[in-house]
Amino acid sequence: MLDSAIKDQLKGLFAQLEAHYTFDIFVHPQHESRAELVDLLEEVASCSDKLSCRLQDSEGLKFILLKEGEDTGIIFRAVPGGHEFTSLLMAVLNADGKGKNFPDEFITRRIKALRGPISLTTYLSLTCTNCPDVVQALNMMVLLNGQIRHEAVDGSINEEEVERMKVQAVPTVFADGEQIHVGRSSMGDLLEKLEARYGSVELEAVETKEYDVLVAGAPAGATAAIYSARKGLKVAIIAERIGGQVNETMGIENLISVPQTTGKQLAQDLKKHLAEYHIDILENRRIEKVEVTEGMKVLSVKGGETYKAPVLIIATGANWRKLNVPGEEKYIGHGVAFCPHCDGPFYKDKEVAVIGGGNSGVEAAIDLAGICSKVTVF
């Protein structure tokens, strides 16, 4: 299942593991995906003496990640191949403190302050490019707050459950049986929804931080931050995520000097470039209020942080457009969707409408025409 090149990479990734991890597998003897799951996990485990598998007959199919024999709270009801293979690897590495994309101190405090217990379930597709971000963000929260558990569920091998829960888009997140999120997201956005649902322990006030320039935004904001830092200014960039909506672009072929890249890779490259300068990168934040006080622009961020500077550069990027018509919010994930690649298969052999005649709209219509019985562009 894994070729020798991938195994060599995994051996390098797992070389620094300190704790021992077990893939605790529970699967029915006749489950159609049993062999695929067991083979995958055994091959991954063969890449380090710090990894092992334990197989038990049970109903359904799942495995739990154990650290030194203790349940981490991370559960996969899936064969984590495709885009979710990275989620499997990051679960192990992050549990050992060797991963990446750990939240900063303030976001970590907010996660730890969530009131539990919290039981989360994410329904996903292995072909979905947005699902890993959600799965990995929630798994990170599990590792930081022992009151949280998270199951990542592949809808294709849990079809009856998907129909019962009326899931029509991925990723869809449920919190103790209540749907709280559908579609792409960031750690900051998911954290806000959990805070609203469960509440938090009150945190101590955080001292206001002062800069020369504050930048709020996406790719243009990253450019502004770099130019400002090159002039010797003290700069912070505040955003929900670096790159903004460019993260959703599958292929980019019109960035001069770069023949081909992806949106996610470009966002990673932006972040890497920002890291070359003395720029504070404050991700997973939503700006709630901007005030001008004694010539200073004061930004209040969700969670209680405040920042101030004499100069504020606003470059907010783009988001999925909504119609703002009655019923739209109610039916997101239940008939209203934004991603033809991730959610299109849920509408196979059905009549669909695509709203928008621009480039993205026509591309979506063409993609959907291959699986839907009828596509109408408005």
Q: Where are these predicted regions, by residue range?
A:
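Long, charged amphipathic helices and adjacent flexible linkers at domain junctions
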Residues: 98-113, 201-207, 212-213
